[in-house]
Curated annotation (Swiss-Prot):
Involved in the biosynthesis of branched-chain amino acids (BCAA). Catalyzes an alkyl-migration followed by a ketol-acid reduction of (S)-2-acetolactate (S2AL) to yield (R)-2,3-dihydroxy-isovalerate. In the isomerase reaction, S2AL is rearranged via a Mg-dependent methyl migration to produce 3-hydroxy-3-methyl-2-ketobutyrate (HMKB). In the reductase reaction, this 2-ketoacid undergoes a metal-dependent reduction by NADPH to yield (R)-2,3-dihydroxy-isovalerate. Belongs to the ketol-acid reductoisomerase family. Its cofactor is Mg(2+). Residues 3-183 form the KARI N-terminal Rossmann domain. One of its GO terms (biological process) is L-valine biosynthetic process. It catalyses: (2R)-2,3-dihydroxy-3-methylbutanoate + NADP(+) = (2S)-2-acetolactate + NADPH + H(+); (2R,3R)-2,3-dihydroxy-3-methylpentanoate + NADP(+) = (S)-2-ethyl-2-hydroxy-3-oxobutanoate + NADPH + H(+). Keywords: Amino-acid biosynthesis, Branched-chain amino acid biosynthesis, Magnesium, Metal-binding, NADP, Oxidoreductase. GO terms for cellular component: cytosol. This is Ketol-acid reductoisomerase (NADP(+)). It comes from Rhodopirellula baltica (strain DSM 10527 / NCIMB 13988 / SH1). NADP(+) binds at residues 26-29, 49, 52, 84-87, 135. Pfam families: KARI_C, KARI_N.
Length: 334
């Protein structure tokens, strides 16, 4: 079934006229969406904790940030753009009791609403508008007259009026210039988590480390292993980004393409796909969400320890030195 996609003519900014939009959290998505909405003529207020770098950033962008509670109370449309792991507590402490009937509660990732960590009271519609790109790209494309495609989803029982508000919001941030795909909270949340865990983050990280370790353990120089298993990944990803698998294969050597066909299926096997299906089931059934919520309530000991350990892996250590040889890279360290 073909996706339903909305464009500029399908959305009307007048549905936000006379409404105050609160952006809660002035991070990557918050700063981009807030500025784009303001430039589109919408009335925007910012909820951000005083004393933080993002508070100062909002001030430098011409906003007058207030507390989360104050921004919620003052707004008609409230978009929660805070980190997933803190949303539920902040919702209970500062948002829930400051909502008024008829408000629209928004997010750009459905984790907390889909998994029941945020359960709005009766009379509050929920809405998701999710740009499919990082905040800096959402902002820069808007400024150039373009827009990053986005997703839109309505919560259970949400009205047609809320849908029109969502489309207006998407237009205000530039989404309808690229196209806004209709989805559901479940689909956005579950596919997002699956992609992160199986391919984009978990899958790629483990593939890179395993490839690097295999070469080093076989006696090859770690510098060579880094180039072949980490550094050159960007070249391939850029080709995929621009033209998909076919363009990538068109652009590489015939030797590399042949190796792709004969060796790829030996690495990603039927057993791998079966494990992917298990991961998807765990996401769908809420098992991953329960683990992540429990981890954070305990102070995130596993998460923090694993983060520290992963930074000591050989591919990370050798990369620090090699990237300093590449003056065209805007090197980042954490």
């Amino acid at each position: 079934m073909a996706a339903t996609i909305y464009y500029e003519n399908d959305a009307d900014l007048s549905h936000l006229k006379g409404k105050k939009v609160a952006i809660l959290g002035y991070g990557s998505q918050g700063h981009a969406q807030a500025q784009n909405l303001r430039d589109s003529g919408c009335e925007v207020i910012i909820g951000q904790r005083p004393g933080s770098a993002n508070y100062d950033l909002a001030v430098s962008h011409g906003f007058e940030p207030m507390s989360i509670a104050e921004a919620t109370k003052a707004a008609d449309v409230i978009n929660v753009l805070l980190p997933d792991e803190v949303q539920a507590d902040i919702y209970r402490d500062s948002i829930r009791d400051n909502l008024s009937e008829g408000n629209v509660l928004m997010c750009s990732h459905g984790f907390n609403i889909h998994f029941g960590q945020i359960d709005p009271p009766k009379g509050i519609d929920t809405l998701l508008v999710a740009p499919k790109g990082p905040g800096h790209l959402v902002r820069s494309e808007y400024e150039k007259g373009g827009g990053v495609p986005a997703l839109i989803a309505l919560g259970e029982g949400a009205s047609e009026t809320t849908k029109q508000i969502g489309l207006a919001y998407a237009k205000g941030i530039g989404g309808t210039r690229g196209g806004v795909i209709e989805t559901t909270f479940a689909e956005e949340t579950e596919t997002d988590l699956f992609g992160e865990q199986v391919v984009l983050c978990g899958g790629v990280s483990e593939l890179v480390k395993a490839g690097f370790d295999t070469l080093v353990e076989a006696g090859y120089q770690p510098e060579m292993a880094y180039f072949e298993c980490m550094h050159e990944l960007k070249l391939i990803v850029d080709l995929l980004y621009e033209g998909g698998l076919s363009y990538m294969r068109y652009s590489i050597s015939n030797t590399a393409e042949y190796g792709d066909y004969v060796t790829g299926p030996r690495i990603i096997t039927d057993e791998t796909k079966a494990e992917m299906k298990k991961v998807l089931e765990e996401i769908q059934q809420g098992e991953f969400a329960r683990k992540w919520i429990s981890e954070n309530r305990a102070g995130a000991p596993f998460f923090k320890a694993t983060r520290r350990r992963e930074r000591l892996h050989g591919v990370e250590q050798i990369g620090l030195g090699l990237r300093r040889m590449m003056n065209w890279i805007d090197e980042k360290e954490v």
